[in-house]
Amino acid sequence: IELISHNTQAHGDYDALEGFIRIGHEYGLEIHAWVENFFIGTTGQSDALIAESEKRDWRCIDRNGVDNFPNEYGSFVFLNPYNRECRDLILEIYREMLENYDLDGLHLDYIRFSEPQRDETKADFGYNADIIAGFQAQYDTDVDPRTLASGSEMWRNWCKFREEIINSFVKEVYDLVREINPEIWISCACGPDLANTPTTIYQNCRDWVANGWMDEVFSMSYSAGLNYPIENGQLFMRAIGDDAFYSVGLSAFGTTERDVLLAQTDGCYRVGCNGVNFFSWGSLFQHEEGYEAAQTASVYRDKAVQTYALNRMLKAGADALSGKLERVYGVFAPENAALYEAHK
């Protein structure tokens, strides 16, 4: 792929993906490639890679023509998701990974447009000329979408048109994965505000689930408070039902207290979520709150098992019951009567 060079800053010429897969499989871990779709980094990074000067028109622009999204992490650049060349480039990257590496899954992050600008303009994205022309052709109108009143019927159509751009790309990824290896797991990271993401970042994970394109949905329910991730998890579970697996994204990168993170994990389990995901791996092990040690001593003291791996799940359940018989119920055996009396 001529437009992309190997990133040598972190590991030189070492093939980190191959290393993760090989070593992870030695430890019995699944390795899923975490990809970012149309988000290609910050302006400084992107200028040196695929958004070079001759490809500047590939960038997605907001209603004022701005082609990046400034925030505390830099100025984010998204490719135009309607542009066929951009879509084909990304799909070709995924094909290369899926055909040449023994991956267990593909995790779609940033599967959306950029969020609106945070300045006083609140400008939303998707105003490239080809996107506008496509919208006008589909709805047989010459209206300029910049003039649409929020909440009007045509504004809703404009939002839906951009949503369908993302929906159709998810379908293309799904078709690619199933063509190469139907056993590869497809998951996605979704914004937590289910009600509004279809009209702000044009992301509608419920559509993907309903069409059978997702094996698992991961909600980015990040909060330092106890209740929000649990309540958000319940909302997603009602929306997804039994059509896909669902895991709650918990924050290990911020100021969440250790005991709160443990309680969030336990709470999500108790309301029936299939699992939790900690963002991110590095934070989980490096955080000053000692997250990793606390997790392995409590909620993750036993080895995890995937809920979709039936044989391993049944064995894990039997092992857990056997352990309880020894550690807990054994206390009530006649020979331990004295111990029981001492703790009454």
Regions found by a protein language model. Give the residues of each.
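Aromatic-lined carbohydrate-binding/catalytic grooves of carbohydrate-active enzymes
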Residues: I1-D13
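Aromatic- and acidic-residue-enriched segments that line the glycan-binding/catalytic groove
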Residues: E2-S5, F39-E72, Y110-L148
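Active-site-adjacent "subsite" loops/lids of carbohydrate-active enzymes
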Residues: A10, L17, I21-R22, H32-N100
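Conserved, mostly hydrophobic/aromatic
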Residues: G24, I90, M97, L106-D109, ...
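Structural preference for beta-strand elements that scaffold enzyme active sites
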Residues: G28-H32, F76, D104-H107, E183-S187, ...
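Active-site beta-loop-alpha junctions enriched in small/polar residues
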Residues: E36-F38, Y110-F113, G191-D193, Y222, ...
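Glycoside hydrolase catalytic-domain groove-lining segments
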Residues: Y127-T256
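Substrate-binding cleft of secreted/luminal carbohydrate-active enzymes
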Residues: W213-E231, L235-F236, D242-H343
